């Protein structure tokens, strides 16, 4: 607190989070001080290493691609991941990825509310990460229930994370709060559409969903009903994408 009081400048990792910490919900008891120091408070977005996260040169993925070739080549990574994880092998399946710590902060209670709606015959879900036993077991359950559609990988691997970013059509990240977030940036780098909750750096780095042309998805998924709307869009996208 003393540092915040006497600092010449205060930074955090996104403009939206800089605004959020001025409120009681996000401020952790320091929201009054944040409001008092608002003239000195700025958000500076995190970034990723474009050389490390580069689908054109990434040695961790089966098929390299770029902005000109991704429509033809990206699906080869999907088929390879389907084979590796024992999912139904069909490049037309709409594959959603989650690479995350499995905790309440990541909004997984919202995902739990719509898992059955998401897991239609045309959708596959790949989960990578560890965390709370509740969520680890939840994804294990759905892996058992929808064995050819859900793959729960309850561990973390840098190699596997790159494969998920490269293989998936969409990346699900409905965080309760997210000062900045990096996974959505990695997904974007690999041409994988982030579906995120409108909070913190997710709001600042992912454009809102455009209902007229279907481009990008950041959505106000603060409730289960809002998440159900997202599941409808996911199912629609799985049936209409080219």
Protein language model features and the residues they cover:
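Catalytic cores of nucleotide-sugar-dependent glycosyltransferases that transfer UDP/GDP/TDP-activated
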Residues: 1-242
């Amino acid at each position: 607190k003393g540092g915040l009081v006497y600092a010449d400048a205060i930074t955090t990792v996104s403009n939206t989070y800089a605004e959020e910490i001025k409120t009681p919900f996000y401020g952790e008891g320091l929201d009054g001080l944040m409001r008092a120091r608002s003239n000195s408070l700025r958000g500076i977005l995190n970034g990723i290493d474009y050389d490390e996260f580069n689908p054109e040169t990434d040695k961790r993925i089966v098929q390299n691609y770029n902005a000109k070739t991704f429509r033809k080549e990206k699906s080869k990574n999907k088929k390879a991941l389907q084979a590796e994880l024992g999912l139904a092998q069909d490049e037309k399946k709409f594959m959603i990825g989650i690479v995350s710590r499995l905790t309440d902060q990541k909004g997984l209670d919202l995902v739990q509310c719509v898992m059955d709606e998401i897991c239609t015959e045309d959708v596959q879900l790949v989960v990578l990460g560890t965390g709370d036993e509740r969520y680890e077991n939840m994804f294990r359950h759905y892996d058992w229930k929808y064995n050819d559609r859900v793959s729960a990988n309850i561990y973390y691997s840098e190699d596997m994370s790159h494969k998920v970013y490269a293989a998936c059509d969409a990346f699900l990240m409905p965080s309760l709060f997210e000062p900045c977030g990096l996974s959505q940036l990695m997904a974007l780098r690999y041409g994988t559409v982030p579906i995120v909750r409108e909070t913190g750096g997710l709001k600042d780095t992912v454009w809102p969903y455009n209902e007229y042309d279907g481009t990008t998805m950041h959505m106000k998924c603060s409730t289960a009903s809002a998440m159900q709307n997202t599941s409808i869009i996911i199912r629609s996208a799985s049936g209409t994408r080219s």
